[in-house]
Each structure stands twice: as structure tokens, then as C-alpha cells.
UniProtKB/Swiss-Prot annotation:
Disulfide bond entries: none
Keywords: Endoplasmic reticulum, Heme, Iron, Membrane, Metal-binding, Microsome, Monooxygenase, Oxidoreductase
Family the UniProt entry places it in: Belongs to the cytochrome P450 family.
Membrane topology: Peripheral membrane protein
Up-regulation conditions: By phenobarbital.
Matches recorded under PROSITE patterns: CYTOCHROME_P450
One Pfam family recorded for the sequence: p450
Organism of provenance: Gallus gallus (Chicken)
Species classification: Eukaryota, Metazoa, Chordata, Craniata, Vertebrata
Compartments, as annotated in UniProt: Endoplasmic reticulum membrane; Microsome membrane
Binding residues annotated for heme, in chain numbering: 436
One term of GO molecular function: oxidoreductase activity, acting on paired donors, with incorporation or reduction of molecular oxygen, reduced flavin or flavoprotein as one donor, and incorporation of one atom of oxygen
Annotated GO biological process: epoxygenase P450 pathway; xenobiotic metabolic process
Protein name in the entry: Cytochrome P450 2H2
Amino acid sequence: MDFLGLPTILLLVCISCFLIAAWRSTSQRGKEPPGPTPIPIIGNVFQLNPWDLMESFKELSKKYGPIFTIHLGPKKVVVLYGYDVVKEALIDNGEAFSGRGNLPLFEKVFKGTGIVTSNGESWRQMRRFALTTLRDFGMGKKSIEERIQEEARFLVERIRNTHEKPFNPTVFLMHAVSNIICSTVFGDRFDYEDKKFLDLIEMLDENERYQNRIQTQLYNFFPTILDYLPGPHKTLIKSIETVDDFITEIIRAHQESFDASCPRDFIDAFINKMQQEKENSYFTVESLTRTTLDLFLAGTGTTSTTLRYGLLILLKHPEIEEKMHKEIDRVVGRDRSPCMADRSQLPYTDAVIHEIQRFIDFLPVNLPRAVIKDTKLRDYFIPKDTMIFPLLSPILQDCKEFPNPEKFDPGHFLNANGTFRKSNYFMPFSAGKRICAGEGLARMELFLFLTSILQNFSLKPVKDRKDIDISPIVTSAANIPRPYEVSFIPR
């Protein structure tokens, strides 16, 4: 036998070294989370029930444990099921899990700017600025709390003018909540009949409807295919672009009338930052537009839907409404507006508001995260940029923390002596570094709007209370209340 030539020997040595290095790398990385075998291109889509994703995830967690992998189309997703593992990821390893999962639909619209869908330094700077600016001070002459109190008075007067006639409260609540964003971001509220305001509300409502469609969600996992097909995803993109144009107009007007010595609102604060830090490439008109758009899209539908769902639940449970009336009358009375300082003296009312958020479980799947580096979670390796679903529903519905979680019970947030009970499992705003930037604003709105309504009105259903259905309409993204009408009876 001829001896192997030197080039052949060198080639074999190189291949051997490569294989050893690859083996060592794999062994050091460890195994990735288990999961069902995906079908090429399609993934595990047919193994999931789009109308009851939580039940599908529950069954998969029983088989594979609290950390498992699914494939949505060609995209790999690691699902985290249960409080312990979600806390371990989002809080204990917050930096590693601080990325936002890549969503092609919103990438088309936001182009990596704003707060909700951006990543890296852009996200850090926009979030830090928004949190600082939205704090309850330094926003012109009125604090955010005062703006909400003022809007609550307008809402109460508008409800009073219905003269006890039954109506669907959706529009009233959406107008009130949207006006808080308008007041904070644009510097002033709109009259409820203002044509420009009504057009904005219609666009926001349309966005919410189309965003909850299953075809829209599928676009994020099959963008190449759905780009060639008509559907709600294309309507949503056009609708968001229309809101974008609306905001751009207002920003242009602000730039023309801007006075650095007298900032009026969020937009002025941003323009001031742009002028102070001209070398900072993250503070641009485009990023201002997208950040403002974020505040509207994230801050209007979620809060108004929670209020609407809360009123429906109180229609079903008049005994809970009555306890809230008595507590509000005792602490606040009828001669002044409720304020945030009252909350600590209203433990039952506070517990009801927390229970509304827990019970409705508005975003069961949560907004997707991503790991920003190769990460180990328990015994598993998760490669950089992997999309993460840190599920909220199993936490808010945990039967050990909240006995009989399917039942609406303010006692879930009350101690035996009637004081308010905090729970680490209360995560409707998510958790960790990506916790909702508008959490503080939303909490204020929910408390001040609901207490103001109940201070002034009793709720009267249009049908027998036993026929009121408080189970949600489950969409592909959110749980929303069933349509209903209510009469507001002055107290």
C-alpha cells in the first residue's frame, strides 16, 4: 500500500480538528429544550389550537416540562410555562432575556425604532427617555394624575348626559383613555366630538380589530408567503401608517411653535432632547414618531378594554359593586375627585382592580422576548436571538397562588384582616427589563377612572344577571369582553 501523501494527511488532520472542535462546542453548549417534531416549513402549527393556545401549551408542558421548543413555520420558539421558570428567565436573568422577538409585521411599520419592537441601544435610550418623561411631574403645568382626574370628570359628565339610557360603553371609555395619551403627548385633550380626534379613534379601533385576527399573527411566522396574499395584515399595515401620518403632522406643528423654555408635552420634551444631543443618532423625528405611535397603540386599547371588561364583571357581581360603593363613599365621599393617595385607604377597591386584570388575562401569551446572547436556562442551552414566549396565563391562573382561579374573587388580593395582599404572581404587565413602560400610567388610569365612575353611578344591566357571560372572546392575541349594554344610574 502506498503511503498517504502529505496534503492528504494534512487534510485529514484538519477535518479531525474541526470535528473535535464541533463536538466540544456542542457538548459545552448542552442540549436545547425538547419539543414536538416539526413538519418542514410548517413547523408545529397543526399541533396547536389557534383558538385555545393555552390548552395546547398546557398539554405540551405536561409532556416536555416547563421549558420546551415549538416551531411556528421555520421559526424556533422556546416556551416558558409557569411562574418559577418565567421569573428565573425574565427577572433573575433579565439582561439575557431583554430582547424583543423579531416580528416581521411590526418591523415593516416601526423599522426597529420606538420602544415596543426595538432592541439594543435604541430600545434602551427610548425606554429610559419615555419612563423619565412620563413620570408624574415635569409635564408642563399639569401632572399626569391631574390630567386623568380632569378627563374622568369629562367622562362622568358625558355618562350623566345619557340619562340612564342603556348603551355600549366601548366608545366612551376609548375616548377617555385616548385623551390621556393625547394630553400627555400632544399637550392638550380633544373634545369628544372633534373630527380629527374621532378619525384617530376610528383608526386605533381598526388597528386593534385587525391585530387580533389569526391571519395577522400568522404573518409574523410566514411573512414571505403572506406578503403575496391579501388579508387583514395588509389592512393593518396601511391603518398604522395612517396613524403614523397623523402623528407626523402634529410633530411638524410642534416643531414650528417649539419654545425650549416652556415644554408643553412629551413631543416638546423629545424635540428638546434632539436639539440638546444633535450627535445622538437615536433621537430623530422618525424615532419620535414611532415612540409616540407606540404610546398610542399600547396605551389605548389595553386600558380601555380592561375598564370595559371590569364594568361587565361588576354587572355580573352587584355585591362586589356595592362593597366598592361603600368603601369609596367612606374614604372619598361625593364632594371631591378620587386621587392616587386614596388607593392605600381603598384596599377592597384596589383588590377588585387587581382581580379584574388577573381574571381577564388580557395577553395570555405575552409579547415575545428574545435572548440577546447564547444563554443557559436550567439544563438547557438557548442560542442567541431565539424567540421566547414567557406565558402569562399560567401565572395569573396559578391555582396555588389563586385558589379557584377561574372564579372572579377579590379575595385573591386581600389578607384575612381585609388589607391589600400583594402577589409576585401578578404580572399583567409582564416582568423584568421589558415590563410595560406604561405600567404606572395604566395603573393610575384604571384606578381613577373606575373609582370616579362608581363614585357617581350604579350599574344597571339590560338583562338578567344570571345571563351575563363574563367569559372572554378569545382571539389569536388577546382576551376581550363580549359586547354588552349598561345603564348608569346617578347616585
